[in-house]
């Protein structure tokens, strides 16, 4: 009996190690744990009425995302360290003419406005989702997340995690180019 009790920690360790190795093998075969499928892919952006982050009292609806050209909807917050890491790249994309709309998620308005002044504002428009309701409707797990929305307001892609050059070039840019061409026709 004592021998079995002594082997229990070893058995638990081996089970944890096996689970870890199994997940690492899946990742090596291309199973990306950050690739979270969205139930909204292929569907219109949910209806919303949100206040401008920078202009209190000015409200926008989903139509602001359906202006005939694709747009990136970037979910961010000042409490999110990864959002800070991706922010410089968003500034670069914006400078290249990529239209990015910011969705400030469950955040303090004054802190968010100060953050944009300090780090630069890549957003053509900043929306305040202080209660997180649009985030909930979009199925947001946390910040940052980025949605590619085509010119008709259809969600075409969702990326959970920071948007960086690798993600842009391999995942989003091909789709951006495709939907930009479609919008130009």
UniProtKB/Swiss-Prot annotation:
Residue ranges of domain Thioredoxin in the record: 39-177
UniProt cross-references to InterPro entries, sorted A to Z: Periplasmic_diS_OxRdtase_DsbE, Redoxin, Thioredoxin-like_sf, Thioredoxin_CS, Thioredoxin_domain, Thioredoxin_ResA/DsbE_sf
Primary subcellular site in the record, as a coarse category: membrane
Gene Ontology MF terms in the entry: disulfide oxidoreductase activity
Transmembrane feature ranges: 5-25
Pfam families per the UniProt record, alphabetical: Redoxin (PF08534)
Protein name: Thiol:disulfide interchange protein DsbE
Species: Salmonella typhimurium (strain LT2 / SGSC1412 / ATCC 700720)
Higher taxonomy: Bacteria, Pseudomonadati, Pseudomonadota, Gammaproteobacteria, Enterobacterales
């Amino acid at each position: 009996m004592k021998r079995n009790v002594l082997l229990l920690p070893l058995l638990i360790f081996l089970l944890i190690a096996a689970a870890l190795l199994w997940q690492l093998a899946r990742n090596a075969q291309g199973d990306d744990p950050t690739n979270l499928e969205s139930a909204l892919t292929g569907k219109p952006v949910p209806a919303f009425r949100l206040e401008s982050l920078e202009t209190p009292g000015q409200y926008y609806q989903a139509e602001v995302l359906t202006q005939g050209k694709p747009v990136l909807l970037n979910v961010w917050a000042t409490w999110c360290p990864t959002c800070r890491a991706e922010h410089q790249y968003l500034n670069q994309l914006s400078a290249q003419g990529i239209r990015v709309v910011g969705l400030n998620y469950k955040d303090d308005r004054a802190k968010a406005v100060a953050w944009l002044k300090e780090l630069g504002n890549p957003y053509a428009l900043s929306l305040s989702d202080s209660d997180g309701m649009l985030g909930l409707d979009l199925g947001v797990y946390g910040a940052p997340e980025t949605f590619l929305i085509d010119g008709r307001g259809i969600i075409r892609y969702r990326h959970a995690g920071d948007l960086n050059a690798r993600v842009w070039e391999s995942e989003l840019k091909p789709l951006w180019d495709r939907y930009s061409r479609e919008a130009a026709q």
